[in-house]
Amino acid sequence: MKKLRCDQTPAWAALNTHFNASGRHFDVREAFARDARRFEAFSQDAPHVFADLSKNLIDADSQALLLALARQCGLEQQRDAMFAGELINSTEQRAVMHFLLRNPPSAQYTPAQAAINKIADAQAEVEVTLNAMLAYAEQVRADAAITDIVNIGIGGSDLGPQMAVLALNEFATAGKRLHFVSNIDGDELAGVLGLVKPENTLFLVASKTFTTTETMTNARSAKAWFEARGGQDIARHFAALTTNVAAANEFGITTTFGFWDWVGGRYSLWSAIGLPLAIAIGAAGFREFLAGAHAMDEHFRTAALEDNLPVRLGLLDVWYRNFHGFSSRSIAPYSSALRRWPAYLQQLEMESNGKRVDKDGQPLPFDTSPVLWGEPGTNGQHAYFQMLHQGTAVVPVEFVAVKRAAHGLPGHHDKLLANVLAQAQALMRGKKDAGGHQDFPGNRPSTFLLLEQLTPASLGALIALQEHRVFVSGAIWGINSFDQWGVELGKVLARDIEPRLQSGDISGLDGSTAGLLQRLR
């Protein structure tokens, strides 16, 4: 029997009825007044992360109905299929096993897991590659002649490593500067090359296929710069993170670290793509990073849906997107170290769930991924928080805060924490003003994620939490969260347009593109 689409389930119909009866007019301030234990009921400890969901527009009834929706959509079975190594990336006929990259060597497997895709064999390959990569990272860390490491990659080969290196700067070794080049705009590469010397620089070329246009254009330019300035020994100063060893060798690179087709780009930070982070924080730190993520994997895999933080967050996303109609979510990390967190989440969620068809290729009659956007606090308060508090659109906000700061500057952290608490409170409480201009409607929802400290383990857990949350909403919507065909069309058209910039040929182009091309020549 064909599986019901989520909007055809009894739970979806019940959620619609509940929303129209009470959810549409739910007031979180009244909910707190009625229930002295609301904070306890809608907050949760998970590995390395505490979450307060109590300021959201949910009650026990909506949560129960969302959990019923999850069960009627087969969420548990879909989760188990991923962890069993089944080919859940249906459009590319691939397993989705990035969780293997953070499994400890002692991990045990069920007979079902061992039978599908030979998970135990894959785990052994992962450990061999991880050990080799971490040994190389320690070699680079010990090499005093290498002062600068330039990572050349884009998408998952850039956003994850860059975000994590910045976040864990407090744990980074002294004497090594990490740089990231992703954009094909030459200004970015030129800016980095102006800071480094050939004899002191290691270039990491991160491209699964070793054919990515942006990455290979930048890599070739970096190689030409290196040779033009008397750089010697390409093999020592370039390493590749790729599965295309032959192409890397042809480029002149002999040091390569690969990964597998069951690792999607936006989930590749845990693989060889994480080499920049391993160089920054060392092998022990990188293993702690993996361990934090594994702890969250186990929580997601084993916890009951009612007590499963990724599930609760993913269902909240469905509630807001499909019933309240909220089209975006603002990401507000109150940590300068997490300044690239919003950009990282943009790819993770919007590339995963920004789909308009289900797994069978059929158009969906409901909305999927929201738009994610944000800036670190307190900067965002002086930019767009005006709209969050007094604008016409309701935008759920997700705060991230760190209890203990790494720096020792007196007074700073208390002020930072006071601000994040105040913003969440102000969004909920609001303020009445007869004149209108200083009226804050309140009842604006927010989620608060709290880390005890920003460490390799807590960052790993925080990332894995978001990965699984995205899986949950994608599973409810019935989409394939692990392909990204939407990035392909523009690439194809760019290859056609590039030679036209030299030739001026506008045949077959639409009027707008033709007009712009002529002005650009």
Swiss-Prot record:
<comment type="similarity">
    <text>Belongs to the GPI family.</text>
</comment>
<feature type="active site" description="Proton donor">
    <location>
        <position position="351"/>
    </location>
</feature>
<dbReference type="InterPro" id="IPR035482">
    <property type="entry name" value="SIS_PGI_2"/>
</dbReference>
<keyword id="KW-0324">Glycolysis</keyword>
<comment type="pathway">
    <text>Carbohydrate degradation; glycolysis; D-glyceraldehyde 3-phosphate and glycerone phosphate from D-glucose: step 2/4.</text>
</comment>
<keyword id="KW-0413">Isomerase</keyword>
<keyword id="KW-0312">Gluconeogenesis</keyword>
<dbReference type="InterPro" id="IPR035476">
    <property type="entry name" value="SIS_PGI_1"/>
</dbReference>
<dbReference type="GO" id="GO:0006096">
    <property type="term" value="P:glycolytic process"/>
</dbReference>
<dbReference type="InterPro" id="IPR023096">
    <property type="entry name" value="G6P_Isomerase_C"/>
</dbReference>
<protein>
    <recommendedName>
        <fullName>Glucose-6-phosphate isomerase</fullName>
        <ecNumber>5.3.1.9</ecNumber>
    </recommendedName>
</protein>
<feature type="active site">
    <location>
        <position position="382"/>
    </location>
</feature>
<comment type="function">
    <text>Catalyzes the reversible isomerization of glucose-6-phosphate to fructose-6-phosphate.</text>
</comment>
<dbReference type="Pfam" id="PF00342">
    <property type="entry name" value="PGI"/>
</dbReference>
<dbReference type="GO" id="GO:0048029">
    <property type="term" value="F:monosaccharide binding"/>
</dbReference>
<keyword id="KW-0963">Cytoplasm</keyword>
<comment type="pathway">
    <text>Carbohydrate biosynthesis; gluconeogenesis.</text>
</comment>
<dbReference type="GO" id="GO:0051156">
    <property type="term" value="P:glucose 6-phosphate metabolic process"/>
</dbReference>
<feature type="active site">
    <location>
        <position position="491"/>
    </location>
</feature>
<dbReference type="GO" id="GO:0097367">
    <property type="term" value="F:carbohydrate derivative binding"/>
</dbReference>
<dbReference type="GO" id="GO:0004347">
    <property type="term" value="F:glucose-6-phosphate isomerase activity"/>
</dbReference>
<dbReference type="InterPro" id="IPR046348">
    <property type="entry name" value="SIS_dom_sf"/>
</dbReference>
<dbReference type="InterPro" id="IPR018189">
    <property type="entry name" value="Phosphoglucose_isomerase_CS"/>
</dbReference>
<dbReference type="InterPro" id="IPR001672">
    <property type="entry name" value="G6P_Isomerase"/>
</dbReference>
<dbReference type="GO" id="GO:0005829">
    <property type="term" value="C:cytosol"/>
</dbReference>
<dbReference type="GO" id="GO:0006094">
    <property type="term" value="P:gluconeogenesis"/>
</dbReference>
